[in-house]
Structure formats: C-alpha cells, structure tokens
C-alpha cells in the first residue's frame, strides 16, 4: 500500500526521489519522508504528515541533498498517520529504512530487540525492521547480509529499501511478498515500488522475484535469490511516457480516466474479436487446450474487480452454460473450498499485485483446479507471471484511486471470455455487439452535463440506496462503491426484489434511491419495485433506456442511449461513475486520493 523510491547516483538525488514519490502517491498519502546520505556521509532525514506536496514544502525549508537516498509515501497500517510514524525510520542514526507491507511477528521481534537495548520511538512495525537490520550489521558489517538475515526472521509480506551512512555508495533492497522494481540509469540506479516512478530516470528495469535481494550502486545492480545466490534476472526496457501522469484538460485524473473508456475499450478489443478462433487465442497458447475441458468456473477478486466477477457470472452461466462461483479473495483464502472436477480458476486485478488475490492464486495452485486464468492490466505483474493463462486488458495506467476504466475493460474481457466459451451461435452476436461498444460508450459520455446537474441534489445527503435486478445488481453495487469511496456518502446496493426484506425501511423523503433500468426481461419487475419506493416518498433517480416510454410518477428519469443487451452492464456503469465524480466535486472531497484509501492494496 505504501510507495518506496530509492536512488544511488553521481548527482544529487533529492529531486529525483521527490518526483518518484509523486508518481507513487496513489499507493498511500497519509505521510511522506526522505533520507539521504550527504557529501560528508551524514544521514539527513525529513518527514511530514500528509501528502507528498507537504514533504516538498518541508524540503524547501531544510537543506537536504545527497547522492544516495530513499523516500516513502505511507498508507498507515501499524500506527496512526503522524510524523513520528512516517518513514524513513532510523536505527542509531546510521541506518535508514523504508518499508511496504506488514511484519506479522513485529511484537515478538520488538520485545527481543528491547532486551538487546534498542529503544523505539514509533508505533510502527517498520522500526522493528530498522533495529533488527542494525543488530545484524553490528555482527557482520555487511549491509546486504544484515538485510537478508533480518528478513529471514520477519514473517509477513513486505519490501524494504535500506541505506547505511557507513556505506554511502550502496542501497540494499529486498522483496518478500510485496512488489519491488530495480531501475538502470546512466551513472545512477534505482529501486521503486512501481516502474511508473522510474519512467523519467531509468532506461530499463528488473522486476524482483519472490525472495530476491539486491545491492544497488551507481555502477551496477547485483541480484541474489532467496538462497542468497547471485543470479541474472531478465532486464526489460522502460519507455518514457509523460502523458501518463498528466491530467490534460481535465480537473482530475478520475474524470480523465472516465472519458478514456471508449479508447481503452477499443484498445482492449483490437485484433481480438475478428472471429471466435482469434478471440480464444487471445487468452494464451494454453487456452485452446484448456477451454474445451472447462466444466465449472471459480472467480476470485477484491473490490471493484469482485463486482466485475459478479457480472461475469451472469454472462458465463447464460452464454457458456458453466456453473460459476464468485468469491471475495480475502474470504476465499481462509476457508475450505470444494473444487469440482475441471474447474477453471480466474483471478482479476488491475495491478496484478493485490495481496489477497495473489494469495488466493497461490492457494488455487495447490488445489485441484484445471488451470488458472488472470485478467489483469499490468503485463509485468506477479499475477500475470504466476497464472497459466493471461488476458491483458489495455486500460493504460490508472491514477485515480477509484477504478473506472480498469473496471470497464475487465468487463469487456469477461464478455469476450464468455463468447470464447460459448458453444452456439450467440457468440457471434456478442462479437457484433462488442464491435459497437466503444461507440456506445462515447454516446453515454455525452450525458456528462446532465449527470453533473444532479450533483447538487446529493451534496447534503448522508445515505443513498442503489437498486438493480439480475446482471444490473452488481452494477448497482459498483455505483454504490464509487459514491462512498469518493464522496463519503454512505451508500448501499440491493437487488430490487429484496426491497421488502429490509431496505424499504430506510426509504423516506430524504433518501435518494438510484435505480439501473435498462430495457431487459426484468424491467417490468423492476418497475413494480420502484413503485414501492415512490409510494414511500423516496427520492427516485432512474437511469432508463432512452427508447422506452416511462411515466415519471415523481421520479427523476435520466435517459441512457440504447445498446445491445450484452453491453448494458458496461454502458450503465459509466453514468454511475459520472454521478459519483460530480457529487464528490460538489462536496469538495479529494476525488483522486480519497481519505483512508490507496490504489494498490499490497497488504492483507
């Protein structure tokens, strides 16, 4: 959840570290800090509560410069957001350390270190790592070995970046369950949680593998495997791309990403839907052998990706006739799962580094599944490397914490999967509709001003209720999630048919009720449910197919351009994204970086 940046260079790296943190801020923004070794081999540190800009302001007031350093932006796990708990953490003024992840046995290690005479100044598990590395350095005077030995004692999933004032020419990194990237520059080398942070500085990168440690200097990067054996890892070119971090004409990244959906869906579909055979090949070389044997499907994901899986269940069961079970990854990994014969295991993740999703995949690989399939947006992610089959969405980098374009490209991928597994001519109709999807999205985006006009009606609301039926129920769930994430309005979603089983008790004149009402086989049923809301005086907002003649009966009707039935869940998602965005803007919340959240959930 936190962002790590580090560099060893022939030049001052303070501004490089700061720019890297700006690109990692999506991973956490409770506090930030930097530590460098200056020209006199002194360890200098600046920490601040709040966002990276606060750190930049503090650095203006403090002369901090050096050729070796580490920096960090934090999402709080152990210890409240504060300067005291911010990284980097020090040990004896000699070692500085940044950390992403959780050290599960930190309490035991803390007590052990106290008996050795170490004193703690923070509430974090990270300070335990700093002191433990210092302890081992005292024994061996080898920073790499000290980090390796300390990591062997620590339980959990984490990544570390470490410097020592007596070793000003080197930076040590280790990965154990949390992603870390090594970057090669000219006269300088780097570490980072995400290659995005290195795009302006590094020419190529190594994606550290599980258990890897590395010693980074200006001249070289040496990588060691989990057995501390020097190894060669694949080096990948890194293309600079300034557009990825620019909002362009948009006020927020989230709005930019909403409006990019037509393009990224086009990119995701490109060269994949020419025919069913071509489509099946898009899921990897093994897919042609695996797909004919599939009898059941398990989908495991978190958050927005879980909602994508719920929608996929309707498509896969309807089109492919395959029993499909959808699980929340954090629940799946801790229960006994019955795996029927010939079950395909599917994981979905934007980043491919979501901790619970990865743990679920590792569990599945030890179970009796036919094969695993990853639907992911990051080609170099752990999820992609570990799965048997892969479908890469082409959403591009998503900066806004609330996922938009990553979600709709996941849905496009799932609809393609359902078509690939379909055994009758309905697959051709799905392909035809998919070809129309980008244009449908463009038409829906033209609703922006109309949806914006609704925002003032929600600004002072405390609660909201979203309703849908059938495949639109997960769409309602996603709409509720978006609203609560960025506007901080408590929002729930229910199947409309469940109104009488509890949620109707919440409905009164102050409760906005948002319904998703495409022209499908459940429309008449949904209308009956909405009459129940109107009869109780609820404030009803209904997103309806513009080809239908609705009687408002006091409801606010928002007409959505008609689209093919298979596309409706994707198309109706977009106005709900716009609604959440404009309500958040009207309330003055931080749209791209909502409180208490982070983009990439790399801790349990």
Curated annotation (Swiss-Prot):
Enzyme Commission code(s) on record: 2.6.1.16
CDD domains: GFAT (cd00714), SIS_GlmS_GlmD_1 (cd05008), SIS_GlmS_GlmD_2 (cd05009)
PROSITE patterns: GATASE_TYPE_2, SIS
Domain Glutamine amidotransferase type-2 per the UniProt entry, residue ranges: 2-219
GO CC term (a single one): cytosol
InterPro entries: GATase_2_dom, GFAT, GFAT_N, GlmS/AgaS_SIS, GlmS/FrlB_SIS, Ntn_hydrolases_N, SIS_dom, SIS_dom_sf
Keywords assigned by UniProt, alphabetized: Aminotransferase, Cytoplasm, Glutamine amidotransferase, Repeat, Transferase
GO MF annotation, one: carbohydrate derivative binding
Record's keyword annotation contains Cytoplasm: yes
First-listed, main subcellular location of the protein, grouped into a coarse class: cytoplasm
Quaternary structure, from the entry: Homodimer.
Name under which the protein is recorded: Glutamine--fructose-6-phosphate aminotransferase [isomerizing]
Natural source organism: Legionella pneumophila (strain Paris)
